[in-house]
Each structure stands twice: as C-alpha cells, then as structure tokens.
Amino acid sequence: GDTVFLREGSYGEFVVPTRSGKPGKMITLKSYPGETAKIDGSDLYIKGWGNALVQVNNIDYMQFENLHICHAHDSENNTDPEGIYITGTSGNITFRGCKVYDIKNDCPLVDAKGDWRSAHAILVLGTDDNTPIRNLLIEKCEIFEIHSGTSEAFTLAGNVVDFTIQDNEVHDVENIGIIIAGGDNLNPKGDISVNYARNGVVRRNKVYRCTHEKSQDYWSQSVSNG
C-alpha cells in the first residue's frame, strides 16, 4: 500500500508502472499536497500507438491523483499521442483529480495514403479475451486541448467491464468527447462476444466544445456535442 508523492515540477519521462498493489493496499502516485506535479512530454519522442505519457499495462490496484499529464505531440499519421493508456488485463485502477491536456497530433486530418490523424487524452483498451479490464474509476478529471483527429478524447473499447466515469469535465477537443465502444479497429482480433466495453456507469460529466471547426479541410461545423 505504498504512496509515492511527486513534488512540484515537471517530469519529462514516461510513467510505466511495473508492480501491482493488492486488495486493501493500493499503490498511489500523486502530487504532494498543495503542489502540482506534471508528467510532461514536451521533450519526449512520441511514436506509434500505446506510447502514452502514463502507461498502465497488466497492472492491478493502483491509483493516480492530482497529476497534470500534458504536452504529448506528434505530426505523423499512424501515430497516436496519448496522455493515459490502460490496457491488457489491468484492474482496480483509479484516476482522480488529474488534468490531461495539450495532447495533439498536428498532421493533416487525412494524408495522401488515406491514413487519418489520431490522438487520445485517455485510451482504455481491453485486449485479453479471457480477462477484461475491470473495476476502473475515472473521476473529477479535466480533459482539454486535445487534437484527436477522427479519434475521441476519452475512449473505452475492447474487453472492459465494471467501470465508472463520473464528475469529469471534457472540453475544447476535436471530434467526440467520451465514447464507450466495441474493439473494432482498435482490437480487431478480439472475440466479438467480449470485445466491447460494458456494465459501466457514466454520470455527471460535463462535455462541451467538441468540434472539428478548426479542421476546415473536412468539417466546418461542430460534429459532436459530446
């Protein structure tokens, strides 16, 4: 049940937990009381998919509190800048009071090969057919300034069960703010009987200014209200 306090400042490194907590003994990573710690990707090389600032892969019983997760940029298609990526068989994961912002892919919305721009503030993707991502709580977080292209700011997809998304604020993002979806192209080999997010609660979230108005080459008006 260890707690790691991060002092005020910017941390220019990927956060990739390698150990899990236990029932009743959560591992916690949080800003020191009264201070703000930033997981800052300004100087990091972002390439491909899953190369998020915070990567939670096959981890159990861990929580993140009051962190700023920000500044992940790229300008290539087939690259997905991500603030938070939760995948594999992770369970009992909490993000509380975090701010995720300035996650951007700045390439053209679609290139000459037909590849589309993509990025995510938070991507939750259950990729194991036998063990879902489970008991996920995302609350009191703020997501903004996301250039997600044709992806969504906050995505739950694949084998994900028993989640709660509550009291968050999502604004000033491209395309859709929050989506609860099937695995589709994100997990194309998943068993269709479990390859979708289910049995969850989404409540009391504020979602606004989700628009492609700045992508004038394809859309000149808002395409989503949330």
Each language-model region and where it sits:
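Residue-level recognition of the GNAT/N-acetyltransferase active site
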Residues: 7, 87, 157
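Hydrophobic, well-ordered secondary-structure segments
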Residues: 81, 92, 115-123, 135, ...
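Short glycine/acidic-rich loop motifs that flank beta-strands on beta-rich extracellular proteins
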Residues: 11-17, 41-44, 48-52, 73-82, ...
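Right-handed parallel beta-helix
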Residues: 26, 32-35, 60-71, 91-104, ...
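Active-site-proximal beta-strand/loop segments in catalytic clefts of secreted hydrolases
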Residues: 7-9, 32
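Extracellular beta-strand-rich solenoid/capping regions of secreted or surface-exposed proteins
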Residues: 11-28, 38-65, 69-91, 121-130
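Short, surface-exposed basic-aromatic patches at helix termini and helix-loop junctions that form
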Residues: 20-22, 159-162
